[in-house]
Amino acid sequence: VYKGRIPLNKYARLLGDIGEKYNFAKLAPETNDVGMTVTTILQDEGYPNLYFYTKLLRKKRKNRPEEDKFPGWLTTTKNRSVIIENLEKDIREENVIVKDPFFVQEAYTFIYDGAGRPIARGKHRMNNSSMDLDLEGETYSDDAIFGKAITNHIRCHSASNTVVIPQ
């Protein structure tokens, strides 16, 4: 388990190296922010097993939207609650076991806000990148939770659920 900040090129290299250790495991960097740079680096370096999300594009003079695929994972308002609810269900039903101490720590401050959105307590009161401050000055994050939610979603929807033990 790793938590911290490193330059994006080193992060991409770290992901690629860990993915290779696990027989080129599927990688799905979140592309909402700086993850697009990480995904681009992985693509440029030829990582063979990136996750691609599908986007429907409406083109002029076309009746049907066209599908286009983009590398990485894009969290949207439509899929955010779905992936969190599916992770919660799979944890409750013991389909997954989480041993990540950062996930456990974040779970204590992960709530549903007034609009019913799953979010780290106080997250949008004062935004400071991935760490946020609430009114009392305490920091909260939901990075580990969303990382596990994305991983769980991809695990549930992939063609193969084979787990490869590293050499």
Walk through the language-model features, giving the residues of each:
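Mg2+-dependent endonuclease catalytic cores in nucleic-acid-processing enzymes, primarily RNase H-like
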Residues: 1-119
